[in-house]
Regions:
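Single-stranded nucleic acid-binding surfaces, predominantly the OB-fold ssDNA-binding core
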Residues: 1-88
Length: 88
C-alpha cells in the first residue's frame, strides 16, 4: 500500500529485544494528507530505515507499507501496526 503525506511528528529511536531474541530498532512517524478532510496515520520504521531516517517535520513523502495485527495475551484486544518498508 502507498500513503502520501507531510510529516507532523518524528519519534525517538526505541530499541528492544523480541521474545525470539532478535534486537529491533524502531521509530514512529506521523503523516497527514493535504486534502480538504485530511487523513493521518502513525507509521513505524524498523532497523536500518529507523536509524538512517534523515527527513524533517513538514516534508512531504510517499511511503510503501504493510499492515500487521497483534493481540494482547488474552486475545481480547487487537492492535494494528503500519510498517514502512520503503520511502520515496
Amino acid at each position: 500500500m502507498d500513503f502520501t503525506g507531510h510529516i507532523t511528528h518524528i519519534g525517538q529511536l526505541e530499541q528492544f529485544d523480541t521474545a525470539r531474541g532478535t534486537h529491533v530498532i524502531t521509530r514512529d512517524i506521523h503523516l497527514e494528507t493535504d486534502e480538504q478532510f485530511p487523513r493521518s496515520g502513525c507509521f513505524t520504521l524498523r532497523n536500518d530505515l529507523a536509524q538512517n531516517f534523515a527527513l524533517s517535520i513538514g516534508e512531504t513523502i510517499t511511503v510503501k507499507f504493510d499492515i500487521t495485527m497483534r493481540t494482547n495475551k488474552e486475545g481480547t484486544r487487537a492492535f494494528n501496526q503500519l510498517n514502512i518498508w520503503r520511502i520515496n
